[in-house]
């Protein structure tokens, strides 16, 4: 019937693109906003607008049960608003003072880290300090080996992947240091790395653990003589 056809059309162009929004406070007054998307292919745009960080879902909306203000009031982050503007869902992170941010999406999970500007903060003991140049890139179902090649070209490092590194990845990175980007990529695919000078060897984590165990055994055998 025409009514059925109309409802199918409206569903096709507007659907819920979000399943959860959560905030975790950080040690330095910042925090992490994690956004679970309905699927990894939903187009997402992240823009800084003064003391607001605006995340826009293009062509998909926020479901009714998530339309709300989340009063965080934790360090830098005051609140998080979720609403719809036409066919697009909009998540607005309201920040109290000057901030830096980086965002990365792995699979259907979008993570946005908000923190004090570098000059104003001391790294905590648990925090790994990344010093690589920041980059922004997006991959939709691209071979992991191709992504590592692109990263190697960006960094002038030699990134060598073992034969057993395979599979595809969907990933979005915004303003992320390249060495952190590499760690995010490796973690998402259960891969590990070994560094030697300007060469980074990438292997599956299980292989890396076995290799390190063998080396430790050999070292202990030598020491026991």
Annotate each predicted stretch with a short phrase:
Residues 2-32, 38-225:
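Sec-dependent N-terminal signal peptides of Gram-negative outer-membrane/periplasmic proteins
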């Amino acid at each position: 019937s025409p009514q059925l056809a109309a409802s199918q059309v409206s569903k096709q162009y507007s659907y819920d693109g979000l399943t959860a929004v959560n905030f975790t406070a950080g040690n330095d007054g910042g925090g992490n906003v994690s956004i679970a998307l309905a699927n990894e292919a939903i187009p997402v745009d992240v823009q800084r607008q003064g003391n607001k960080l605006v995340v826009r879902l293009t062509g998909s909306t926020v479901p009714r049960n998530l339309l709300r203000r989340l009063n965080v009031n934790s360090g830098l982050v005051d609140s998080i608003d979720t609403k719809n503007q036409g066919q697009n869902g909009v998540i607005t992170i309201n920040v109290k003072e000057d901030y830096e941010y980086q965002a990365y999406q792995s699979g259907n999970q979008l993570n946005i880290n908000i923190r004090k500007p570098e000059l104003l903060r001391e790294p905590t003991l648990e925090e790994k300090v990344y010093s690589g140049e920041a980059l922004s890139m997006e991959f939709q179902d691209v071979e992991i080996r191709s992504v590592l090649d692109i990263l190697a070209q960006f960094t002038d490092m030699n990134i060598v992947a073992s034969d057993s590194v395979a599979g595809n990845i969907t990933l979005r990175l915004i303003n992320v240091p390249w060495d952190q980007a590499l760690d995010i990529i490796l973690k998402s695919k259960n891969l590990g790395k070994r560094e030697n000078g300007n060469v980074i060897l990438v292997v599956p984590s299980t292989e890396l653990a076995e290799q390190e165990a063998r080396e430790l055994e050999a070292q202990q055998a030598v020491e026991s003589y």
